[in-house]
Amino acid sequence: MDLLGLKELDNNKLVSKAKENGVEFSDLFLLSSGYLRDRENASASVSSKNERMVLNEERQNCWTKRNDPKGLTYYQLLKPSEVEILSRPETRRKRMACQVFFLNYYISTIEYHKLRKERLEEFTACTSSLKQSKQKRLWKEHCGRERAFLRKKRTKIQCSHFDLLVKLGQGGYGSVWLAKKRNTHELLAMKMMKKSTLQQLNEVKHILNERDILTNTNSEWLVKLYYAFQDKEKVYLAMEYVPGGDFRTFLTTKGLLHENQTRFYLAEMVAAISAVHKLGYMHRDLKPENFLIDQKGHIKLSDFGLSTAIVTSNQVNRLQHALVSAVNPQRPYLTQKQRRNIYKALLEKNENKVNSVVGSPEYMAPEVVYGKKYDRTVDYWSLGCICYECLVGYPPFSGSTLQETWTNLYYWREMLQRPSKNENGIYDKKARSVSDEAWSFITKCLTEPTSRFQSTIEIQKHPFFKRLHWNGLRKRAVPPFVPRLENQLDTSYFDDFNDEQVLDAYKDVYEKQRKAEQKAKSNGVMNGNQRQFLGFTFKYRPNARKPLVGRHREKRQLRKEKPEKKNNSTKQKDLITVSHNKGTTAIEDLDEDKRSKTKGHKTKSSRVHRLLERKGKDLYEFLL
């Protein structure tokens, strides 16, 4: 609310009277001066006694008594029904999205005016010694660049601004593509989802939740979101491209991991989980598929659709029904080797690609399935399952069928067995087994909620990580695996959707998507409810947007000190990538060097003109 609104609100009679009576208001936005003014006008126009009584009763109902956690009592000028509407999660999300939208709008506007003023001062300083005719010509070009930037700033982000290069993945309601933004040549992972399918599968909240989490974080352990936009049919999430594939592919290729390797990856997973918990969220769907490996071999966490407590009652009922139906089946005894072979066979058949209704049962905590209250410790349960799989070769509660997996989860206390234990309960020392520290960590994760780790600090103090330096995991530690990439467009660590075997493995996923689209079409839901996607649009804004005046001088100074050899000249095709921090393309620097070498000596006016043109182009590209 602006100062004028606050002044008007303070001068309002009802508010002044309420202040005299000692009434405290928790939120000025809930006190609409227009609403109060309408009430005053209404009371002035009332003539009969009955109408006055009705109006007074209605006015009393508008004051809702509220108690905050600190025990203070305050009143809000809202009806109970209006308070109930405001307390809904979707209303709170829309209100927050509205606030974030206007904050970003005013911040970007203020920064633009600040940078435009700096550019004007620089232009004036560089052209003050030129002739008036040349000043007019340069001024006209300067204004043209400013107008071009403003026009480009008003342009909405569209799918046509990106080139879809390679398909990276396919889900039940959308697909993921490697895309390149045309004006900046950024390589991004574009997630495309149909609105009608999302609404039919009740996945709208999951997508909105993922968008909200990604826009609130700037952690190096979480995948970064650059753009979120929509059209009439689809919604789009343009995220950071992580070329090393997911941790599931790495596990399938490597099989069993040594404890040193497991310790490294678990430590980075703990750091990623801690970043999510600091935002006030629970991931709830941790599994190897959601951890990605970047080009340097480090871990990044993705897929936040099931984060925090947003599971619907229907989904919980389905899970409870599946769990109850799996209470009394016959469970034949299987050795560790047999269970490992069965799980490998399931991975080869790709039967887990469609198995994500509300998380993965192999990694879900029992209290989530029971429908009980749970906290962030459910993520530590999933972490223990991943640790067990890294060391043993399969999740601790996996089965040959989904029904058997539910059964194992129900009897989790009996199914959790230390590896290399035979039928007689004797450990074989010659076999490859889990160390005492690792098993202590696993059992500390896979236990009752009150007995689990309660924070990441407790995990860091566990003996399993005693030889690990937590500070500087990304800088000091050397990853066990670093992806070998031929170029930036290398997608060899993802499924090749031109291969018939891969398409055959995803046939159930395509069938699920086709049925959802047909059902949405039969129900008359073509483009989905557009109101559900309000506040979805997002555009990444760097933390520091400073003009690039000094950086050009630093670049020229570096070129003078360290001239490049002709034999090691950089190719233009390798210089297309844009740095998000610097905002300039290397291809422009290369072209500038070529022009300076070929044209030779130039006059002072031409050098000033070229300098202003280049700085303006780089700066506008950086701001966009």
From Swiss-Prot:
All copies of domain AGC-kinase C-terminal, residue ranges: 466-548
Gene Ontology biological process terms in this record: ascospore-type prospore membrane formation; intracellular signal transduction; lipid droplet localization to prospore membrane leading edge; regulation of ascospore-type prospore membrane formation
InterPro entries the UniProt entry points to: AGC-kinase_C (IPR000961), Kinase-like_dom_sf (IPR011009), Pkinase_C (IPR017892), Prot_kinase_dom (IPR000719), Protein_kinase_ATP_BS (IPR017441), Ser/Thr_kinase_AS (IPR008271), Ser_Thr_kinase_AGC (IPR050236)
Annotated binding of ATP, by residue: 168-176, 191
Biased composition (Basic and acidic residues): 560-574
A GO cellular component annotation in the UniProt record: nucleus
Keywords: ATP-binding, Cytoplasm, Kinase, Meiosis, Nucleotide-binding, Nucleus, Phosphoprotein, Serine/threonine-protein kinase, Transferase
Signal peptide boundaries: none
Domain annotation Protein kinase: ranges: 162-465
Reaction(s) this enzyme catalyzes, per UniProt: L-seryl-[protein] + ATP = O-phospho-L-seryl-[protein] + ADP + H(+); L-threonyl-[protein] + ATP = O-phospho-L-threonyl-[protein] + ADP + H(+)
Pfam family, one: Pkinase
Catalytic residues (UniProt): 285 (proton acceptor)
One term of GO molecular function: protein serine/threonine kinase activity
Keyword Cytoplasm: yes
Domain of life: Eukaryota
Residue segments, region Disordered: 545-617
Composition skew (Basic residues), residue ranges: 545-559, 596-609
PROSITE patterns (alphabetical): AGC_KINASE_CTER, PROTEIN_KINASE_ATP, PROTEIN_KINASE_DOM, PROTEIN_KINASE_ST
SMART domains according to UniProt: S_TK_X, S_TKc
E.C. code: 2.7.11.1
Cellular localization per UniProt: Cytoplasm; Nucleus, Nucleolus
Role played: Has a role in meiosis.
Family per record: Belongs to the protein kinase superfamily. Ser/Thr protein kinase family.
Protein name per its UniProtKB record: Serine/threonine-protein kinase ppk35
Upper lineage: Eukaryota, Fungi, Dikarya, Ascomycota, Taphrinomycotina
